[in-house]
Regions:
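N-terminal localization/anchoring segments of enzymes in phospholipid and broader phosphate metabolism
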Residues: 1-532, 550-554, 566-704
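Glycine/threonine-rich ATP-lid/beta-loop region of ATP-binding domains
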Residues: 542-545, 549
């Protein structure tokens, strides 16, 4: 495209816009109060990871004198300057939301407030005194910083207190010390109530109030809370002889990554500020001064305090089908009778857990093969895989050790699986394995049958409660053959085959999507039915974006549901008038990936693990699969249509890259997530009714 930079929005700036949409949920007054705090905490944890990876990457480019503009036309220095400006403004909005919009309402409506030491009642003062001496004092370690004691290596994202001191013995002698706020203790503590008001105090405030007891020979001149964020992107030698050991070494190096952000309170003592800048070797562009408290992520736990259930969203509980699986106690029988599409969390993820659990115990199951990218800390799926191996089944598991920030967890699981006798693959050289697939090979009367679960999300029973994802259960023979071929590629040296139905990256997925978009463009030019509807988490790939622009120019209606980063710009005259971009941010995190192409009046729909990003299409093993069963296909179409009708959680991207809520005038208020929940409840009642009607009740004599 001749002037591509005008039509390609920078991915980092787009990510900042996404985090701003999450912040809007914290600002939204009709959201429950504790949920607003939870959204605020999410914006903080999102920003942490953004600095650890993306901002760190930009700074590394600048340090290595890399000056080439990106696809949006920005050089690394220009981008860092734009991010710096946008981040400062964003963090101001975070604290404005907290102090102007949330905490006053928390005090007025819920009678809950945070207190500082000077506002404590005598009873509360006695409580903090006892808490400090009994709990805190034994844990705290004051670390002096001088010529013989260097500045300590502080943990990434840890909260610390910088203390400027003056010696009582040597008048005028200045020195500094650091006290780390113990991360092992809760960030907040509930105080004795003040009348009807529930009161809380932050851990750092208690420590600050009693610092003199740690520095009896010194006079405290200033106390400054601070927090550092380190470069946490891993550099891994994938050719290493012991790949697991190489990952473990990289994790240790990450803990010593260079600081990329220093958070301070506004009006921090100037001498202490200079001391920290020098000690951490950080420049002004990495310093962020906030109103406080530093690090808002603790509000995610605070939102769960007992007694505040009415201040939270009504839970969207998964429906549990009668029996174990849609009215069947035998999962394999249910799948034999037809493909099953499951929409989480509206329909329980337990069916996926049960699929592996039943396979582990079934004497007719010969083998289980599965990919794992992110799993929970106490995964029932891994427990079942271990059980299956102990029961003598052939169990092969690909555990992706390079899943960012889950490396340690995955290493631990890989070791346990190996110890149990599973064949464990750590991933593929140069690629991350991100596809979601489980294959069960079972011996039956008519021969060997392969049962599959294919998904859009991780095999993680914890996140499955709050992420929306889709999964397909099938025993389609051709799907099974494709699955076996895929596992042969992953576990051995097989050449990528010609799959009958699967679309697999990095060999074939890019060309498939490019072909499908071009096909819709040609259909539009011929006057045939055309259209593209896609739901992904991120849209970044320049080539895909360029093809979507060409489709729009040809008259193809393109409807995009992109939760996070979107580098495509809709509504540009002569380029993208026929493209709409919607982002849904609400109670649940939208995570499913769905692709619909009108195909000249014979629509085709696909689901899978891949977003439209270069890393997914070119540098990962990803899987996208078609929905072919007519009943499930109709349901998949309906899922997309419901999302497109959302008027509550949806925002639409404008041609200036801003996002606007739906104008509700004359429109019905529709929350797609609640719609799916109510539909799932209705299906459950229907199944229960069918089950009840099928029960035969014997008539007994009156004497009985």
């Amino acid at each position: 495209m001749s002037d591509k930079k005008n039509y390609y929005y920078n991915r980092e700036l787009s990510w900042m816009d996404f985090n701003a949409r999450v912040l809007e949920e914290a600002q939204k007054k009709d959201n429950p109060l504790m949920e607003r705090l939870r959204f605020l905490a999410i914006t903080g944890s999102n920003l942490d990871e953004f600095f650890m990876v993306r901002v760190a990457g930009v700074k590394s480019q600048i340090a290595s004198n890399y000056t080439k503009p990106d696809d949006s036309g920005m050089t690394p220095k220009e981008l860092l300057s734009a991010l710096d400006k946008k981040t400062h403004a964003f963090m101001e909005k975070q604290y404005s939301c907290l102090y102007r919009s949330i905490l006053p309402v928390l005090k007025k409506q819920a009678e809950i407030e945070f207190r500082t030491p000077e506002k404590l009642t005598p009873e509360q003062r006695a409580f903090t005194d006892e808490y400090f001496h009994r709990v805190l004092f034994p844990v705290l370690t004051p670390l002096a910083v001088d010529s013989s004691r260097p500045f300590p290596m502080l943990a990434n994202k840890s909260l610390n207190l910088a203390v400027r001191l003056s010696s009582k013995e040597n008048k005028g002698e200045k020195c500094f010390a650091v006290v780390q706020v113990p991360s092992i203790l809760p960030r907040f503590t509930e105080l004795p109530a003040d009348g009807d008001t529930r009161c809380f105090i932050l851990l750092e405030d208690i420590i600050t109030d009693y610092l003199e007891e740690l520095f009896e020979l010194h006079e405290i001149k200033a106390v400054c809370p601070f927090r550092i964020t380190r470069n946490s992107d891993l550099t891994i030698d994938e050719e290493a002889d012991d790949f697991m050991y190489e990952i473990e070494k990289s994790i240790k190096r990450r803990k010593r990554g260079r600081p990329v952000r220093l958070e301070l309170l506004q009006h921090t003592d100037e001498d202490t500020r200079k001391f920290l800048i020098k000690a951490l070797n950080i420049n002004e562009s990495g310093i962020y001064e906030v109103q406080g408290p530093i690090d808002l992520t603790f509000f995610s736990k605070f939102a769960n305090i007992p007694g505040c259930e009415k201040l939270c969203f009504a839970p969207i509980r998964s429906t549990t089908p009668p029996g174990d699986f849609f009215g069947y106690t035998d999962i394999f029988r249910a799948i034999r009778e037809g493909d099953r599409l499951v929409h989480h969390p509206y329909e329980t993820f337990d069916c996926v857990v049960q699929f592996i659990a039943q396979a582990a115990e079934d004497e007719n199951v010969l083998a289980i093969k599965q990919t794992l990218y992110r799993v929970s800390g106490n995964s029932p799926i891994i427990a079942s895989l271990i059980k299956a191996a102990e029961n003598g089944k052939q169990v092969t598991v690909l555990v992706e050790l390079k899943a960012r920030f889950d490396e340690e967890n995955n290493i631990n699981w890989a070791k346990k699986l190996e110890k149990a006798g599973c064949h464990v693959i750590y991933g593929l050289t140069g690629l991350k394995t991100h596809c979601k697939i489980a294959l069960v090979v079972r011996r039956e009367e008519d021969g060997i049958r392969r049962y599959l679960h294919l998904g859009t999300g991780n095999y993680n029973d914890s996140t499955a409660k709050i992420y929306t994802d889709l999964g397909l259960f099938t025993c389609n023979e051709q799907f099974g053959a494709d699955a076996s071929s895929l596992f042969n590629v992953i576990t051995g040296y097989s050449r990528p085959p010609e799959y009958k139905h699967f679309i697999v990256a990095p060999h074939g997925m890019r060309s498939f999507f490019e072909y499908m978009i071009r096909q819709e463009t040609e259909n539009a030019k011929k006057g045939l039915p055309s259209g593209i509807t896609v739901k992904v988490n991120s849209l970044v790939d320049p080539k895909i974006i360029e093809l979507l622009y060409e489709a729009s120019k040809a008259g193809v209606r393109v409807q995009l549901i992109v939760r996070g980063i979107c580098c495509l710009i809709p509504g540009i005259e002569g380029v993208s008038e026929n493209i709409t971009v919607m982002s849904i941010v609400g109670q649940l995190l939208e995570h499913s990936r769905i692709f619909r192409f009108e195909n000249a009046g014979n629509p085709r729909i696909y689901m899978g693990s891949a977003d439209w990003m270069p890393r997914n299409l070119d540098r990962r093993v990803e899987l996208v699969f078609p929905i072919e069963d007519e009943t499930q296909k109709a349901r998949a179409f309906g899922i997309l249509d419901t999302m497109l009708s959302d008027t509550t959680n949806a925002r639409f991207m404008q041609s200036d890259t801003s996002y606007e809520h739906v104008d509700l005038r004359g429109k019905k208020k529709i929350n797609s997530q609640l719609t799916f929940y109510h539909e799932a409840q209705a299906r459950l009642k229907e199944l229960q009714s069918i089950e009840k009607d099928s029960v035969l009740i014997p008539i007994h004599s009156a004497e009985e």
